[in-house]
């Protein structure tokens, strides 16, 4: 079974990845972006319980002072909700066959934590681009700021708004 875990910064905390991404978008000359929020996403493949997923989140992946987490698995959905009246959600991940160093080190850390049964971990990054941005601009953001086409795949979807 695969558990999807998302780690993001709390609303009242500056998201450093989002902050820098917003600056890069502005450097492209794209106007209308109010805020960028990032989420680190982990696909944890293994025979583990919801309690073990919580342990991984709380003791390894998230800093509970500044971050929050969500997760979903079979018949369980406690994921972070990506709701905003006018935003785009972009997901960036490695292409098949590309080494995921963060995923590999996360797998190793899970083993050290004492959680058995995990076979693999793959990572992705989600970006919530909040503001008045066109689909053409989102493609430009992906291609010029977020994605290396040799190693990454990406997808995007409009959330709410116009």
Go through the PLM ranges and name each one:
Residues 1-162:
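Non-catalytic terminal accessory/regulatory regions of metabolic enzymes
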